[in-house]
């Protein structure tokens, strides 16, 4: 009987001791509800290291609540007394909740964690946005990925907002985390999120040395986004950089058919012809572009360059001609090209009188054509 009383006493003492320790967790919860975060921290930190409560799910639930609630209370005003109770406080909130779920075999607190996860995902998004705006891209990526992780938790299983995936992709891109950038941008590109995602995905592939996949993305984007101008021009640049001129022209021909009112396309094809010194074809396209965009001054300059270069080529041919009659006729032909160049350069100068390349070309042409008065007036503007 005495032995039984002894055992009962021991059990009672253990029970009282355990209850006392658990009351510390309850006290911490009460303190955080009254926004006494520092005192709540002291109480919960003791509970975490006490053997009686170290494996109690509610201990970690309360720690998660403390970390999250204090962080959210201080976030807008950047109150570090609230947001830095612990290092990486919001991440510790998530880890604490996950620990609580792991210990909660009977799932008694799952509903409580579920309630917190909706707001926790939102808090990670806000944290990521703050880091991103401050160009702290690695930290932004970390926060956005946690927002995704929480949003995809089986506890809440909400449909992830594509804007969150986009933000995560952008943080990965800006932080030069290329593999992750490819991962997130690929998902967006499959959903036809925007032309920008195709362009960024192509650049991410190029950054990891996968030019084949990058080219496929742009090719797909041309059709997907109805010959989006930026995608088309990026693909043309890719073809030209790899010496695939024929494919560049095929693409531009198709783009002009699909978007006949887009002056960038004949302008670009004209520049391709100009680069290959096929000046007559270049002039034809550039004039068409100028009709579509009569205020686009750089086209005037490009037309001037074509006529100028044609004149130079004809002049070179004249030097090889022995017949005086043919020589004079060839020089006259060159002069006509130079005079046409003057017309376009003067239009460019009239629209943008401070442009040095235009001023220099006019000075050269006035000199070549013996237009002394105009040459002298232009000389003063050369810097």
Residue ranges and their predicted role:
Residues 21-75, 83-85:
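Start-of-domain marker
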Residues 47, 100, 147, 187-188, ...:
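Canonical positions in the second alpha-helix
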Residues 52-54, 105, 152, 159, ...:
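Short coil turns that delineate tetratricopeptide repeat
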Residues 57-59, 110, 156-157, 164, ...:
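TPR alpha-solenoid repeat register
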Residues 62, 116, 126, 160-161, ...:
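Canonical tetratricopeptide repeat
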Residues 66-135, 151-162, 309-344:
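Short coil/linker segments at helix-helix boundaries
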